[in-house]
Amino acid sequence: MSKLPHLTIRRAGPPDAAAVRSLTRDAYAQWIPVIGREPLPMKADYEKAVREHEIDLLYSDDKLVALIEVFLTADHLFIENIAVSPEHQGKGLGHQLLKHAETKARNAGLGELRLLTNQAFATNVRLYQSVGFRIDRTEPHFGGGTTVHMSKQIAGGES
């Protein structure tokens, strides 16, 4: 795992929607041959998402390299999307963004993180499990395949 130059994180706003879409499409393109279609994050409305969710952008110097999209509920923080540019995958940025999500949840008084992923995204499932997420249940996905519901209890929250 090579070290990246200086990393900074900032909240996305409406002017960032195109960059969010571009990074997400690049990050998820690897899964098209695996599932035979574009994954749902590649089709999302990011103009709407930057208004309704918290999307934090991770930069290496001045280059956008990763992002995390979350929203708060009454009892947990839901991770809608994590995307890391293909050339920066495997460098620990996903782990860093998951820790960032834990901090957000704690700051909001929440003790649980939740997310969904496609069972075919085996490397992602393993990543989430490696940082303490557990599989709560699986269910058939309306577009084919299997959706994996995962959660992680965190210390310092109320849930």
Model-assigned labels for residue ranges:
Residues S2, T146-S159:
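Terminal substrate-recognition subdomain of acyl/acetyltransferases
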Residues L115-N124, H141-T146:
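Conserved beta-strand-loop-alpha-helix junction that forms the acyl-donor binding cleft
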Residues L7, R11-E87, H95-K104, I135-G143, ...:
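Acetyl-CoA-dependent GNAT
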Residues Y128, F133:
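Conserved active-site tyrosine of GNAT-family acetyltransferases
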Residues A105-T117:
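Conserved GNAT acetyl-CoA-binding A-motif
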Residues S85-K91, Q119-A120:
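Active-site acidic-Proline motif in GNAT/NAT acetyltransferases
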Residues L110-G111, R134, S159:
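Intrinsically disordered, low-complexity, positively biased terminal segments
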